[in-house]
Structure formats: C-alpha cells, structure tokens
Amino acid sequence: MPMASVQGWRGKVLVGLLALLCLWPLMAAAQDKPLSAFYRETWTTRQGLPHNQVNAIAQSPDGYLWLGTWEGLVRYNGLEFHVFDRANTPELKDNGIRSVRAASDGAVVIGTSRGGVTVKRGDRWRTWMEKDGLAQEEVMDALLDRQGRLWVATESAGITRMDGEVPVQFNERN
C-alpha cells in the first residue's frame, strides 16, 4: 500500500509537469499582443516638447519622465512638460541633451552634446566641464554608480570617473 501511494503521488506530479509543459507555449502566446493593442500617445512640439527629436528617456523614482532633446531637458509629470534649458537653468551649459539617467536616490544625470555633464539633486544642479577634470565636454552618456561616483563617456576622449573632486581618466593610453 505505501508503494502504491508513492507511485500515485509521483504519477500526479509527472502528469502535472507534463500539463504545464504543454500549456507553457499557449501561455506565452497569449502574452504576445500586437503594438496596436497597447495605449500609445505621441508627443511633439505641439504638446510642449521643445524639439521633436527625443534622444534619451528616463523615469526618476518620484515618477517623473525625463526627456533629453536637442533644445533642452524636459520633465513630464503626466499632464504637462517643463523645459529646462540654458535660458532658465544656467547650470545647463548646452541645450543639446544626449543622455538622461535617473539614479535610485532621485538624482538625474544629464549628458550634453557640448556642455559637459550636469547632475540635478532636488533643487541643486552641479555641472562638470573640462576645467573640472572631464576629458571632453562632448558627452555621449553618463551615470552614477552604486558608490555615487560619476562616470562620463565622452565622444572621443574616453571615459572620466569623478571620485569626489579627483577625475580619473580611462582612454586608449591607459
């Protein structure tokens, strides 16, 4: 009797696993939806973007969407756009935004095409340029690592890591 109950238990598990394996493709196929099945909204200069080309998108922990365009940084709250550019944000040295990254602590890291890199923390903005140790002001991407160090990938001069106030350069020579 104990042997029969063990075999019965194993049989049920085997049948259950086989059923799951047979249903797996159906479950996966049920999740494939055409793009038209999803809600889609298009934003252009008509809705408030400063430029129709969006180069980067990030979402900060507080829910804002951050968009990088050739005419400035945009914060979107779901209803309206707020544009940050050289005219209203002197810390942004260039309107051409190539990269935007949102850090887990709420900081927003902004890489510009000719104005270095800027980090926004709350209402404070800080910009790094060549005079601050960047290898180049033409930034392709930038981010903060888990230790809070700023890493900046430049257009043609390698990578700069900011350890506090001390820049460390990584390029073809080192």
Model-derived segments and spans:
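Carboxylate-rich, polar loop motifs that coordinate divalent cations or form catalytic acidic clusters
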Residues: 1-174
